[in-house]
Design a protein with these regions (language model features):
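Feature captures the catalytic ectodomains and active-site-proximal regions of enzymes
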Residues: 1-178
């Protein structure tokens, strides 16, 4: 999916795209990956399996935005759908004076994380590529974005068969600093 998005960006914009990979955090699930993409010195997990950055919760977009605001850069975090539903003037106001804007898009997770819909994950990837291509236009045209980084909090391996118990790790294996 990343390669397809990169190719589409090059085809439809006057810009360039570079595709790089890196090691995902373990376990490779959304709440850990989103925390790993935030600035901070430490990532930890409490007994309720909440992921913390420098002791601060990362559960909600508001909490992740607070972590961003603790850095010297002027920044904000927002959900993709919230940004999309804003009027043009509201989006411009949101981006005014910001050095960094985190836009969270989770349509693949929303489909792939649930057993009844996980077989639709490939369609969700195509939808995500279309939506991300569209949001790029908003970032460039309305938010004056020039350097845009599209990241993934984790990858996924899709199988048509359920995982064996031996493929899973007990949650008790994770506690404290990661």
């Amino acid at each position: 999916s990343a390669s397809e998005l990169s190719e589409r960006i090059v085809r439809t914009t006057k810009g360039t795209a570079e595709l790089e990979s890196m090691q995902a955090i373990f376990p490779s699930i959304t709440k850990f990956g989103m925390a790993a993409l935030l600035p901070g010195r430490s990532i930890s997990v409490n007994d309720s399996m909440d992921v913390l950055v420098d002791g601060n919760s990362t559960r909600s977009t508001l909490e992740r935005s607070a972590i961003l605001n603790a850095t010297p850069k002027a920044s904000v975090a927002i959900q993709y759908n919230d940004l999309l539903n804003m009027k043009k003037d509201e989006r411009r106001e949101l981006g005014a004076g910001k050095d960094v804007i985190y836009i969270y898009h989770n349509s693949i997770d929303a489909i792939g994380d649930k057993a009844p819909t996980e077989s639709k994950v490939f369609d969700a990837c195509e939808t995500a590529i279309q939506e991300l291509s569209g949001i790029l236009r908003i970032i460039v045209n309305e938010l004056s974005g020039t350097n845009i980084f599209i990241t993934a909090d984790h990858g996924f391996l899709y199988t048509y068969k359920p995982l064996n118990e031996s493929d899973k790790i007990d949650r008790k294996a994770f506690s404290g600093n990661v």
